[in-house]
Amino acid sequence: MMLKLVLRAQRGMRAFAGIGATRKLMLAAEASAPSSVAEASSIFAKVGRDIPLKVVPRAERRAARKAAKHSADAATGHKVVRTSSLPARISFALLAGSISGSIVWNFVLDDGIKSRVKETLGATFLGDIYAIIAKKVEETVKPFTDPSRQKLLPDWPIPQVPADTPTVPVLVLDLEDTLVHSEWSRKHGWRHAKRPGVDEFLETLCQYYEIVIFSQNYGAEEIVQKLDPKQCALHILSRDATRYLNGAHVKDLSNLNRDLRQVVILDDDPAAYQLQPENAIPVTPFTNGRDRDDHELKDLIPFLKALASERVPDFRQVIGEFRDEDGVVRDLATKYGARVHQLEMQKEQKKKKGFGGFVRGRLSHHPASPTGGVAASGFSSGPHVLKRWTLLDSSAYVVAPRCIKEKCM
């Protein structure tokens, strides 16, 4: 035991002596600052040979390197020229300011504020300068705000149907939180839950509509392939087909290359159809993938079938009949079902009246007709939309739906 203590004491004394010698050499190096490249090189050689490099403080090593570099510059005649960083900072600030201003102007401010700014600047000498700058900025950001092409859908007839096929209505369906709900977790990654009734919805309405699935995100094709394996949807559009307006990616139906009177869109986000709200049927967002009791899509099937099968001239008129006082369509399927039930009750009452009711109706100068139904929305040709429809009755209309039906059934 005593022997171990003695050996440890000897090792400690040797280490202390080594540190003392190292410190002496470092002090000597500091006292004699290198005045030439040779002296600086000798110091570095001495540090590597006699003084362990790891015990030399970093500040002292940096001072030795600076002294050696200064001596080398003095020996070769090179002069260190200091340049000011102020111009570079000013240029960077101007660039960052212009980019930030463009983003705020095109993606944050609404049209009302923009118009007021234009009027104010137009009344001053800065009006012409503003017009030139605004035009350049608009040309720069246009690829990021406008749809990637003017015609989002090909001309009718599309390649999937015969050339003599008459045009059919267009049903635009939002993907996120309307047909599917997507969520991400660290354990499972991305998972997509189909809304209940989406299969029946697509397979039924593809007989009546040219279905377009419109997503606000990229990569919608992979989701739609799993969602719609029978390819009932004829077109898939992604974010590049949207128009960025008022901070939202808007689905501009005017770029569909179809008659807007025969277009209807289902979406859970009012900002997505802000350019054509009269064509929209709002739906409740599907945000709980575990909810298997949702029946909104299934409830809308009867109305959408009747809307297409009755050859309505303008869908917007019919949808407008279901708007509330604030101009928003709510619970359309419920309201439509109530009107259908009301007309059925009226039909039953007429049957009960018998022959007397028939005679009174013939003698009347103003035959009774149901009021408050979809038929009161301004179109008189064709049967009432609220009647019990017979599927695929009109041979003049169902040529195209049958062609489309063969694709997905």
UniProtKB/Swiss-Prot annotation:
Keyword Transmembrane: yes
Its membrane topology: Single-pass membrane protein
Interval spanned by the transit peptide: 1-63
Mitochondrial matrix topological intervals: 64-89
Record keyword Transcription regulation present: no
Highest taxon of the lineage: Eukaryota
Cellular localization per UniProt: Mitochondrion inner membrane
GO cellular component, one term: mitochondrial inner membrane
GO biological process, one term: protein transport
Record family assignment: Belongs to the TIM50 family.
Main function: Essential component of the TIM23 complex, a complex that mediates the translocation of transit peptide-containing proteins across the mitochondrial inner membrane. Required to direct preproteins in transit and direct them to the channel protein TIM23, and possibly facilitates transfer of the translocating proteins from the TOM complex to the TIM23 complex.
Name of this chain's protein: Mitochondrial import inner membrane translocase subunit TIM50
